[in-house]
Each structure stands twice: as structure tokens, then as C-alpha cells.
Amino acid sequence: MNNLVRSNFQDHPFHLVSPSLWPLYTSISLLVLTSNAALAMHNFANGHYSVYLGLILVISSMSFWFRDVITEGSFLGDHTLAVQKGLNLGVILFIVSEALFFMAIFWAFFHSALTPTVELGGQWPPIGIEPINPFELPLLNTVILLSSGATVTYAHHSIIGRNREGALYGSVATVLLAIVFTGFQGVEYSVSSFTISDGAFGTCFYFGTGFHGLHVIIGTIFLLVALWRIFAYHLTDNHHLGFEAGILYWHFVDVVWLFLYISIYYWGS
């Protein structure tokens, strides 16, 4: 329903969402993914293949849901100014909730680090733990992630300035840097001398950096969708709400990584 037709039926600017299967489909997909991941971690038979099934379901549900939202905003005219304000507020509240989640992780880390118990050997890092050198791969990853923040900002300013080519180049550079960051994070995990089961240090380290890595992957998906929409001429200098939400989320990921690097990698080692 376009704006002209809508004006004949409703006297408010808000988007009344049609019934959709995707929230239920996404919930079931996430349940399948998390349940199968737990089974795989406990070495159940074919558990890893079940995780792949869960990933396929989650990716498909996200794709279908993104398709509908893009159609509503770009072609049906459902994203009025009032709707955009509501979506912006929703993104901000979502990021605040994510910040509180990471605050709990930092709380757990500093609780153990500032008052190490007898079980930890009365010191931090605990006896037997060889922490990762913060000036090697973690420092390189910090430079890579901060560089991605600069490139995504360049892409944002480019699209505002109607420089489509600059927006494309900036977005491509950001996605590539994000993929490199994720790959290096995997390399770091593979060469680490401790695991998530190695006491409070291992748990806090992998819980914090692992969930941050998950957020990097989610942010990369958001930016990939925005990149495709720039390529498909969906976004303009005054209509790029999804891109702005992805950029705001990406800057949040940058800030969280700085706190992780300073607290866990540098101070915690």
C-alpha cells in the first residue's frame, strides 16, 4: 500500500505491520541452533552437522525477514518519518541492552581479577595460565577494527554527500576488514594455550571475546545487506535508515573491543 492509497484508509503515519511468519520461524531457528550447539559441545553423535542445519535455518529466516522489511521501506512507502523515529529509538535501546550485557561480563572479569581467590592461586592471571601477548595479534586486530570504523564512517559521509562510488568502496573495505578481523580471532583461539574451561580467566576471556566476535559477525551481515542495497540503488542521501543502524551498531562493536583489549588483553595479562 503506497502513501497515496494509505491516506484514504488511515489518519496516522504509523506502519501497521501485516501478519508475518518470520518472527515464529526465526524463534524456532534460534532454538534449533542453540540446542544443537549445546549437543555438539557435549560430543553428541552428528552434533556438528545439526549446528549447520540450525545456521541454515537462521540465515534463511533472516533473509526472508530482511526482504520483507526492505520491500516495506523502499517500495511500499511504509517507513514514514514517524516510523523512522521509532526504529531509531528501537536500535538505540537495543544497543543499550547490549552494553548492559557486556557490562555484566566485565563485572565478572574484574570481580575475579581484583580479588583472586585461593582456588586461583591468589594471583591474576591464575597459576598455570599463559595469557596472550597483547602486543601481537590482539594489537593488530585492534588496528583492523578501528580502521573498519573509519571506512564505514567514510561510506556514511559518502552516501550523505551523494557519492555512491565512495559509499560502495567504503562499505566493501569495511566488510573485508571485518572478515579479516574474524579470521584472526579464530587464529588466536586456535593457538591459545588455555580454553574456556580453564577457570575464571578462560571463561571470562572466551565469553567476552567470543560474544564480541558474534556481534562482529552480526554487524558484518548488516553491512553486507546495506552494501547490496547501495549497489541496487535502494539507498539515497536522505533515506538510508538501515545503513545508519548498521553503522551505529558497528561503532558500538568498536567501543566494546577497546574495553576488551584494555581490560582483558592488556591489564588482565
UniProtKB/Swiss-Prot annotation:
Entry's Gene Ontology cellular component terms: mitochondrial inner membrane
InterPro entries: Cyt_c/ubiquinol_Oxase_su3, Cyt_c_oxase_su3_dom, Cyt_c_oxidase-like_su3, Cyt_c_oxidase_su3-like_sf, Cyt_c_oxidase_su3_a-hlx
Endpoints of the signal sequence: none
Taxonomy, superkingdom: Eukaryota
Keywords: Membrane, Mitochondrion, Mitochondrion inner membrane, Translocase, Transmembrane, Transmembrane helix
Reactions catalysed: 4 Fe(II)-[cytochrome c] + O2 + 8 H(+)(in) = 4 Fe(III)-[cytochrome c] + 2 H2O + 4 H(+)(out)
Transmembrane segments: 13-33, 46-66, 90-110, 138-160, 167-187, 207-227, 245-265
Membrane topology recorded in Swiss-Prot or TrEMBL: Multi-pass membrane protein
EC number: 7.1.1.9
The keyword Transmembrane belongs to this UniProt entry's keyword annotation: yes
Localization (cell): Mitochondrion inner membrane
GO molecular function: cytochrome-c oxidase activity
Gene Ontology biological-process annotations: mitochondrial electron transport, cytochrome c to oxygen
Subunit structure: Component of the cytochrome c oxidase (complex IV, CIV), a multisubunit enzyme composed of a catalytic core of 3 subunits and several supernumerary subunits. The complex exists as a monomer or a dimer and forms supercomplexes (SCs) in the inner mitochondrial membrane with ubiquinol-cytochrome c oxidoreductase (cytochrome b-c1 complex, complex III, CIII).
Record function comment: Component of the cytochrome c oxidase, the last enzyme in the mitochondrial electron transport chain which drives oxidative phosphorylation. The respiratory chain contains 3 multisubunit complexes succinate dehydrogenase (complex II, CII), ubiquinol-cytochrome c oxidoreductase (cytochrome b-c1 complex, complex III, CIII) and cytochrome c oxidase (complex IV, CIV), that cooperate to transfer electrons derived from NADH and succinate to molecular oxygen, creating an electrochemical gradient over the inner membrane that drives transmembrane transport and the ATP synthase.
Family: Belongs to the cytochrome c oxidase subunit 3 family.
Name of the protein: Cytochrome c oxidase subunit 3
Organism: Pyricularia grisea
Encoding gene per record: COX3
